[in-house]
């Protein structure tokens, strides 16, 4: 049976020295989107604060890098942050489960802003967005048509549509993928069980058996399948028949026309990997219409270093915090 969203009950509250967190929900269409709302130290509900929506990578959840690293540390710097689970994933509702549909993912951002503007302590004129990996691509795409976002940042932002089209890097990879998806949809329409595949190998042993050595794949397995980053809301499952829209989608389409907000792009200067966030960072920088845009290269950092490693994420935040302070204020 498909897993449903957690019931929208009184939020649980967790307090740390420098921020407070509440688990909340907001609506996307007919289902609940689960989110963690973080408040800065000495939060005063009679005042108004800038807010930042934090989006997780493909296959991830709010308890990983988007919330536990960037959401927490931005809250400690005086911002309200909202890290959410994508629709159909993690603790959020929506069907079919484990879908990766760009239109649905982008709509989550608009619904997140709809939620924030109902909170009396959020200044609706000072809302920004930050996305990590595929969440960065979705954040950029959302910001093009969601003018309530006043500042945009990506950390190793990746264009998921490009990744899907490139596939195994053979000329007909995208067409072969679409043919396979079409066949699977036909089978499911006739009663077959949904095909749940995986994003990455399920263990280091499976990685070695497959003979995969690309730095992004190796470090993804280390992050997602070990205590380093493993979370129940990130089960490494993907509904294969949901992928056709992603193959025909481009996260940066029309950025040269519609992406005008101040933009800060963070990429790693270490070994480039298969997910392509290094080149996507340059592509986005060159295409964005934003008159204020910066490209930060963290020396020696790989894609996954910028998920959770203290030194690289610290260097990213050294520029992200003043960027958001300049454009949103604290």
What kind of feature is each model-predicted range?
Residues 18-47:
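N-terminal cap/lid segment of alpha/beta-hydrolase-fold proteins
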Residues 59-72, 86:
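The serine-hydrolase catalytic nucleophile loop
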Residues 73-91:
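Conserved alpha/beta-hydrolase
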Residues 99-120:
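Alpha/beta-hydrolase active-site loop
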Residues 140-223:
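Alpha/beta-hydrolase-fold enzymes
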Residues 265-267:
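Short beta-strand/loop motif that positions the catalytic acidic residue
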Residues 272-281:
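Conserved alpha/beta-hydrolase "acid-adjacent" motif
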Residues 301-313:
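Catalytic histidine-centered segment of alpha/beta-hydrolase-like enzymes
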């Amino acid at each position: 049976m498909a897993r449903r969203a957690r019931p929208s009950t009184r939020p649980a509250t967790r307090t740390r020295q420098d921020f407070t967190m509440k688990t909340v929900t907001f609506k996307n269409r007919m289902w609940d989107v689960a989110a963690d709302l973080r408040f800065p130290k000495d939060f005063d509900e009679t005042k108004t604060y800038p807010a930042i929506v934090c989006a997780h990578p493909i296959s991830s959840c709010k308890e990983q890098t988007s919330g536990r690293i960037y959401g927490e540390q931005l809250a400690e710097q005086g911002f309200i942050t909202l890290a959410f689970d994508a629709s159909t994933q993690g603790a959020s509702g929506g069907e079919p489960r484990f879908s990766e549909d760009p239109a649905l993912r982008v709509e989550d951002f608009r619904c997140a802003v709809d939620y924030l503007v109902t909170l009396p302590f959020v200044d609706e004129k000072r809302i920004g967005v930050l996305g990590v990996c595929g969440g960065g691509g979705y954040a950029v795409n959302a910001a093009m048509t969601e003018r309530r976002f006043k500042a945009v940042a990506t950390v190793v932002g990746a264009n998921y549509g490009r990744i899907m089209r490139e596939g195994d890097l053979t000329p007909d990879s995208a067409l072969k993928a679409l043919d396979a998806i079409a066949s699977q949809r036909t089978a499911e329409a006739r009663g077959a069980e949904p095909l749940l595949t995986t994003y990455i190998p399920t263990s280091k042993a499976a990685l070695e058996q497959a003979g995969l050595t690309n730095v992004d794949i190796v470090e993804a397995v280390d992050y997602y399948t070990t205590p380093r980053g493993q979370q129940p809301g990130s089960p490494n499952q993907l509904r294969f028949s949901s992928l056709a829209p992603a193959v025909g989608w481009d996260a940066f389409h029309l950025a040269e026309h519609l992406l005008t907000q101040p933009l800060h792009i963070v990429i790693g200067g270490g070994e480039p990997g298969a997910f392509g966030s290094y080149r996507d960072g340059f592509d986005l920088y060159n295409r964005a219409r934003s008159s204020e845009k910066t490209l930060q290269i963290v020396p020696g950092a790989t894609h996954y270093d910028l998920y959770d490693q203290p030194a690289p994420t610290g260097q990213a935040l050294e520029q992200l915090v003043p960027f958001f302070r300049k454009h949103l204020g604290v």
